[in-house]
C-alpha cells in the first residue's frame, strides 16, 4: 500500500492540534518570567526570503530538472556568514502535482543543507500570488529590473 505523504502530514497535524488543545493552560498568557526564559533560550531570528539565484520561481527551485543543491549550499553558507539564521521558502503545488516523491526528497535535501548552516526554515505552502499562469518545465527568462518577475501563482 502506497502512503500519500500529504495525507499523513495532514492527519498528524490534526491529531497534534486536537492533542494540544487538551491542555487547560493553553489559553493563559505567559508570565513575564516565562516569556523572558523562553526568549533567553532562543537566538534572535534574522532572516529573509530565500530562493537560489539559479531559480526564477518556486517551480525552478523544486523541480528535478533545475533543483540546484550546490547553489543552495553556497548561498545558505553566505547567509550564515552574515548572521542570518532563518529563511522563508516558498513551496510549489505544481511540482508537488507532477513529481511528489522528488519534491519531498528535494525538501529533505534543502533542510539538510539549511541545518548544516544552522538555518531554520519557514515554509510557505502553495502561495497563490503573482503571475496567474504556471506551467511545469522550462521557465521564462527573468525580466531585468522587475523583482520576482517570474514568480507564479500556485
Which residues does each PLM region occupy?
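N-terminal Rossmann-like NAD(P)+-binding domain of SDR-like oxidoreductases, especially those catalyzing
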Residues: 11
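Bacterial Sec-dependent signal peptides at the C-terminal "C-region" and cleavage site
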Residues: 14-28
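Active-site mouth of glycoside hydrolases
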Residues: 25-154
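Bacterial N-terminal signal peptides that target proteins for export
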Residues: 1-8
Amino acid at each position: 500500500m502506497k502512503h500519500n505523504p500529504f495525507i499523513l502530514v495532514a492527519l498528524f497535524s490534526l491529531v497534534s492540534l486536537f492533542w494540544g488543545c487538551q491542555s487547560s493552560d493553553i489559553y493563559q498568557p505567559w508570565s513575564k518570567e516565562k516569556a523572558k526564559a523562553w526568549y533567553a533560550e532562543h537566538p534572535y531570528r534574522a532572516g529573509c526570503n530565500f530562493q537560489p539565484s539559479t531559480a526564477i520561481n518556486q517551480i525552478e527551485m523544486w523541480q528535478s530538472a533545475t533543483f540546484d543543491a550546490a547553489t543552495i549550499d553556497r548561498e545558505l553558507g553566505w547567509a550564515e556568514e552574515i548572521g542570518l539564521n532563518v529563511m522563508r521558502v516558498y513551496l510549489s503545488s505544481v511540482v508537488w502535482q507532477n513529481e511528489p516523491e522528488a519534491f519531498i526528497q528535494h525538501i529533505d535535501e534543502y533542510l539538510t543543507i539549511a541545518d548544516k548552516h544552522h538555518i531554520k526554515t519557514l515554509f510557505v505552502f502553495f502561495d497563490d500570488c503573482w503571475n496567474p499562469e504556471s506551467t511545469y518545465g522550462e521557465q521564462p527568462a527573468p525580466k531585468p529590473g522587475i523583482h520576482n518577475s517570474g514568480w507564479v501563482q500556485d
